[in-house]
Amino acid sequence: MNNRPIRLLTSGRAGLGAGALITAVVLLIALGAVWTPVAFADGCPDAEVTFARGTGEPPGIGRVGQAFVDSLRQQTGMEIGVYPVNYAASRLQLHGGDGANDAISHIKSMASSCPNTKLVLGGYSQGATVIDIVAGVPLGSISFGSPLPAAYADNVAAVAVFGNPSNRAGGSLSSLSPLFGSKAIDLCNPTDPICHVGPGNEFSGHIDGYIPTYTTQAASFVVQRLRAGSVPHLPGSVPQLPGSVLQMPGTAAPAPESLHGR
């Protein structure tokens, strides 16, 4: 388990499914990824994105994660660090709990070593499931791991997930997370069979359907949270429960099936 902050930039592609969907998505998505460490003068960026990649991707944050980070940088002009969640994003999807534990360990480390850094959590496809666990979203009757302790919730400024399978299994992160409800945006392309139930689904909706429309929209939402000026607290006190829901930024067609605030 990594306890030292690591800020990385990555690129790649990922996918997630169940049964026949898994094989098809992995075959269509699995591409190489290259990441390069980025150092900050004092080791603490203005904000940091902890992102979990999807099924079959090499270590890193994946193509969707990279597009999200790039858009966030462009919109804020801030120093944005990146931490890729360390877990085996395998086809059998047995390691989501490991990924959640790694993300939680890193959040705790950042709260201690960089208390003024605003933390952003994100995930795509199977990686969204990892963030569901961190956020305390129930995944049916199966327990995959423990959520982030409530004492650290205020250190997290925003959450953004894409192609989240939990939307097919009971609801969105933004509607079900007791820690991050109003801080979260959960985006599902309405042609994505991994998160959407209904006609018109195509594998391309999951693989190619999130860049740039949805990654830009998610970044715009996160920018609002980062500029809200909430000051991280030292762990120990119980954070205030999420309050009002922020209005979603507009997007170009095709409009995403946003599950924020539902």
Curated annotation (Swiss-Prot):
Residues 241-262 are annotated as: Disordered. SMART domains: Cutinase (SM01110). It comes from the Bacteria. One of its GO terms (cellular component) is extracellular region. The record marks Q126 as: Transition state stabilizer. Residues 1-41 form the signal peptide. Keywords: Disulfide bond, Hydrolase, Secreted, Serine esterase, Signal. It is found in: Secreted. One of its GO terms (biological process) is lipid catabolic process. Disulfide bonds join C44-C114, C188-C195. InterPro entries: AB_hydrolase_fold, Cutinase/axe, CUTINASE_1. Shows weak esterase activity with the p-nitrophenol-linked aliphatic ester pNP-butyrate. Does not exhibit cutinase activity. PANTHER family: CUTINASE 4 (PTHR33630:SF9), CUTINASE RV1984C-RELATED-RELATED (PTHR33630). Belongs to the cutinase family. This is Probable carboxylesterase Culp3. The gene is cut3.
